[in-house]
């Protein structure tokens, strides 16, 4: 069983998995490492690291700005692996998922990417702009090094595609709770419930819900139906807001993470 799968398997029935997202290299690589430590101390079961990219089309303004900062600072995919490897020196239980876009992986090369990800301690990969129908080659390579391949499901995803995803996805399904980009405002819990039930009829994987979860209240509501709660824009916004005061940044991120993880477990 993979480390990512074990996170869900070992989680008590009524305790939901908490998956915070931060952008790797935002405010510095050392800062990312410290943020990862703070998130774990405050209840993170899985950490999603955003891989810097110049054209993050699926992301809203908060996360897009974080990518702009990291691209400007020259943060590379190799830098992301370095941070994960450092994290693994003291933590062998928290799962790490890389979330990003296809171009940096293609430039790196599928097999070198998979090898470097595995060697650093990455557990899962989510490629936002890679259609499942075109993902089989990368899936085979990731399977070969024991890395889960995670896919997005949107409210607009057709049943036929769900059937196909059941044959290719692993780790968990990332359900996009809103039509739009990350950080969007309105969360329709009835829509979330309906689509989670629809996904469960076809795909036998845990379901994490992201987009639109901003605080402990929205996290609690979503956790009634999902297996995992994914929070990104609110945390990345704190990193941006307190970029000039690392102590306060770490405290604010830790407080929000603790508030969310406590209420869903």
Curated annotation (Swiss-Prot):
Write down the EC number. Answer: 4.2.1.20
Q: Which PROSITE patterns match?
A: TRP_SYNTHASE_ALPHA
Q: Describe the reaction catalysed, as an equation.
A: (1S,2R)-1-C-(indol-3-yl)glycerol 3-phosphate + L-serine = D-glyceraldehyde 3-phosphate + L-tryptophan + H2O
Q: Name one GO molecular function term.
A: tryptophan synthase activity
Listed A to Z, the keywords are:
Amino-acid biosynthesis, Aromatic amino acid biosynthesis, Lyase, Tryptophan biosynthesis
Q: How is this protein annotated for GO cellular component?
A: cytosol
**Taxonomically, which superkingdom?**
Bacteria
Q: In this record, what's one Pfam family?
A: Trp_syntA
Active site: residue positions:
48 (proton acceptor), 59 (proton acceptor)
Quick one: which pathway?
A: Amino-acid biosynthesis; L-tryptophan biosynthesis; L-tryptophan from chorismate: step 5/5
> Does the keyword Lyase belong to this entry?
yes
What is the role of the protein in this entry? The alpha subunit is responsible for the aldol cleavage of indoleglycerol phosphate to indole and glyceraldehyde 3-phosphate.
Subunit comment for this entry?
Answer: Tetramer of two alpha and two beta chains.
Family label: Belongs to the TrpA family.
Tell me what this protein is called.
Answer: Tryptophan synthase alpha chain
The scientific name of the source species is: Vesicomyosocius okutanii subsp. Calyptogena okutanii (strain HA)
**What's the gene?**
trpA
């Amino acid at each position: 069983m993979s480390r990512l799968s074990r996170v869900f398997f070992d989680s008590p029935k009524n305790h939901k998995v908490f998956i915070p997202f931060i952008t790797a290299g935002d405010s510095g690589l050392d800062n990312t490492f410290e943020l990862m430590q703070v998130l774990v101390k405050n209840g993170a079961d899985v950490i999603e690291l955003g891989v810097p990219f110049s054209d993050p089309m699926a992301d809203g303004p908060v996360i897009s700005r974080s990518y702009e900062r990291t691209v400007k600072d020259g943060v590379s995919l190799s830098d992301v692996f370095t941070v994960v490897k450092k994290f693994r020196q003291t933590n062998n239980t928290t799962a790490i998922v890389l979330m990003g876009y296809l171009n940096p992986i293609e430039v790196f090369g599928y097999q070198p990417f998979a090898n470097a990800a595995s060697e650093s301690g990455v557990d899962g990969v989510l490629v936002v702009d890679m259609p499942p129908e075109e993902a089989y080659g990368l899936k085979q390579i990731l399977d070969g090094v024991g890395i889960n391949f995670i896919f997005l499901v949107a409210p607009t995803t057709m049943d036929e595609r769900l059937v196909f995803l059941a044959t290719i996805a692993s780790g968990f399904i990332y359900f996009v709770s809103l039509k739009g980009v990350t950080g969007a405002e309105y969360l329709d819990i009835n829509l979330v419930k309906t689509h989670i039930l629809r996904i469960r009829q076809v795909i036998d994987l845990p379901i994490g819900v992201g987009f639109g979860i901003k605080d402990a209240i929205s996290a609690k509501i979503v956790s009634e139906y999902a297996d995992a709660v994914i929070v990104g824009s609110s945390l990345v916004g704190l990193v941006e807001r307190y970029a000039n005061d690392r102590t306060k940044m770490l405290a604010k991120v830790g407080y929000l993470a603790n508030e969310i993880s406590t209420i869903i477990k």
